[in-house]
Amino acid sequence: MTQTVQTNGVQPLSKTWELSLYELQRTPQEAITDGLEIAVSPRSLHSELMCPICLDMLKNTMTTKECLHRFCADCIITALRSGNKECPTCRKKLVSKRSLRPDPNFDALISKIYPSRDEYEAHQERVLARISKHNNQQALSHSIEEGLKIQAMNRLQRGKKHQIENGSGAEDNGDSSHCSNASVHSNQEAGPSIKRTKTSDDSGLDMDNATENGGGDIALDGVSEIELVFRPHPTLMEKEDAAQTRYIKTSGNATVDHLSKYLAVRLALEEMRKNGEASPINVEAASEKQYTIYIPTASNQFTVLNGSFSLELVSEKYWKVNKPMELYFAPTKEHK
């Protein structure tokens, strides 16, 4: 194969290409002329239609002039502004946006394969939102379960500690009368402490751990803490549930909806433990709309709290007393 090349009008030069063994042996592919169609799954084309930067389908495709790699217009322009002025795929130098060219033919090809691009993107967003919500729900359930386990361990350790203290006090009592008086005085001081511990344990909340570590009364910088006494509604709840008083200490930025969601998940976990169920379906279905939160007002009346109110706002607007705020809960009528 010979080709004549003109060089600046001086004299024509001839250049010969020699075919390789592969080129000599290969046979050309036959053109399809009978209208045959080959079905190709769009999923198999995903790697060809995907932007290497955002890993999503190409949008407003731009092609590099040097290496012919394709990227989304926004992705490659952002990469050139903040990166090393090189192709993210092969690291060839790209001086500026002048090294790129739009590729409308490739965009037209994608629109042929995915005619409803907006519907596809909306479906992707719904799937991602569902996955994110499921993961957040699992993380919340796992956090509450871990809290219950730590609480049980703390109860066991406190029980052993009180047994050891009571045992040592009894031994000292047999040694001398002075030690006997000291042990009696110590037991009298320990009595209210044991009673308070029992009350906190019955509430089912992990508050004593923070108190033992010396951090129970220390609030975060710039964030106030609210102490709550959380009881079932005296008239809207059944009598057997009336003893479920809970003591909570949380951030003042938390809202009433956060409190309702915590209550729904906590009660679902307790019900699951009580019935021995292994499936977390009830926990995942827990919602802040399952319970309504009330605050007592004058003359034994109860006011329904708006879910968007923060606990700090509720305290300033309704409570105004320097003691733990009392709230009441009951199932929402439409969720009964």
Swiss-Prot record:
<dbReference type="GO" id="GO:1905304">
    <property type="term" value="P:regulation of cardiac myofibril assembly"/>
</dbReference>
<keyword id="KW-0963">Cytoplasm</keyword>
<dbReference type="GO" id="GO:0000151">
    <property type="term" value="C:ubiquitin ligase complex"/>
</dbReference>
<dbReference type="GO" id="GO:0032330">
    <property type="term" value="P:regulation of chondrocyte differentiation"/>
</dbReference>
<keyword id="KW-0862">Zinc</keyword>
<feature type="region of interest" description="Interaction with HIP2">
    <location>
        <begin position="2"/>
        <end position="179"/>
    </location>
</feature>
<dbReference type="Pfam" id="PF16207">
    <property type="entry name" value="RAWUL"/>
</dbReference>
<feature type="compositionally biased region" description="Polar residues">
    <location>
        <begin position="176"/>
        <end position="190"/>
    </location>
</feature>
<keyword id="KW-0833">Ubl conjugation pathway</keyword>
<comment type="function">
    <text>E3 ubiquitin-protein ligase that mediates monoubiquitination of 'Lys-119' of histone H2A (H2AK119Ub), thereby playing a central role in histone code and gene regulation. H2AK119Ub gives a specific tag for epigenetic transcriptional repression. Essential component of a Polycomb group (PcG) multiprotein PRC1-like complex, a complex class required to maintain the transcriptionally repressive state of many genes, including Hox genes, throughout development. PcG PRC1 complex acts via chromatin remodeling and modification of histones, rendering chromatin heritably changed in its expressibility.</text>
</comment>
<protein>
    <recommendedName>
        <fullName>E3 ubiquitin-protein ligase RING2</fullName>
        <ecNumber>2.3.2.27</ecNumber>
    </recommendedName>
</protein>
<keyword id="KW-0158">Chromosome</keyword>
<dbReference type="GO" id="GO:0031519">
    <property type="term" value="C:PcG protein complex"/>
</dbReference>
<dbReference type="GO" id="GO:1905295">
    <property type="term" value="P:regulation of neural crest cell fate specification"/>
</dbReference>
<keyword id="KW-0805">Transcription regulation</keyword>
<dbReference type="GO" id="GO:0016567">
    <property type="term" value="P:protein ubiquitination"/>
</dbReference>
<comment type="pathway">
    <text>Protein modification; protein ubiquitination.</text>
</comment>
<dbReference type="GO" id="GO:0000122">
    <property type="term" value="P:negative regulation of transcription by RNA polymerase II"/>
</dbReference>
<dbReference type="GO" id="GO:0005694">
    <property type="term" value="C:chromosome"/>
</dbReference>
<dbReference type="GO" id="GO:0005634">
    <property type="term" value="C:nucleus"/>
</dbReference>
<dbReference type="GO" id="GO:0061630">
    <property type="term" value="F:ubiquitin protein ligase activity"/>
</dbReference>
<dbReference type="GO" id="GO:1902254">
    <property type="term" value="P:negative regulation of intrinsic apoptotic signaling pathway by p53 class mediator"/>
</dbReference>
<dbReference type="InterPro" id="IPR001841">
    <property type="entry name" value="Znf_RING"/>
</dbReference>
<dbReference type="GO" id="GO:0040029">
    <property type="term" value="P:epigenetic regulation of gene expression"/>
</dbReference>
<dbReference type="GO" id="GO:0071339">
    <property type="term" value="C:MLL1 complex"/>
</dbReference>
<keyword id="KW-0804">Transcription</keyword>
<dbReference type="GO" id="GO:0140862">
    <property type="term" value="F:histone H2AK119 ubiquitin ligase activity"/>
</dbReference>
<dbReference type="GO" id="GO:0008270">
    <property type="term" value="F:zinc ion binding"/>
</dbReference>
<keyword id="KW-0539">Nucleus</keyword>
<dbReference type="GO" id="GO:0048701">
    <property type="term" value="P:embryonic cranial skeleton morphogenesis"/>
</dbReference>
<dbReference type="Pfam" id="PF13923">
    <property type="entry name" value="zf-C3HC4_2"/>
</dbReference>
<keyword id="KW-0863">Zinc-finger</keyword>
<dbReference type="GO" id="GO:1905292">
    <property type="term" value="P:regulation of neural crest cell differentiation"/>
</dbReference>
<dbReference type="GO" id="GO:0003161">
    <property type="term" value="P:cardiac conduction system development"/>
</dbReference>
<keyword id="KW-0479">Metal-binding</keyword>
<dbReference type="InterPro" id="IPR032443">
    <property type="entry name" value="RAWUL"/>
</dbReference>
<dbReference type="InterPro" id="IPR043540">
    <property type="entry name" value="RING1/RING2"/>
</dbReference>
<dbReference type="GO" id="GO:0048484">
    <property type="term" value="P:enteric nervous system development"/>
</dbReference>
<dbReference type="InterPro" id="IPR013083">
    <property type="entry name" value="Znf_RING/FYVE/PHD"/>
</dbReference>
<keyword id="KW-0808">Transferase</keyword>
<dbReference type="GO" id="GO:0060042">
    <property type="term" value="P:retina morphogenesis in camera-type eye"/>
</dbReference>
<keyword id="KW-0678">Repressor</keyword>
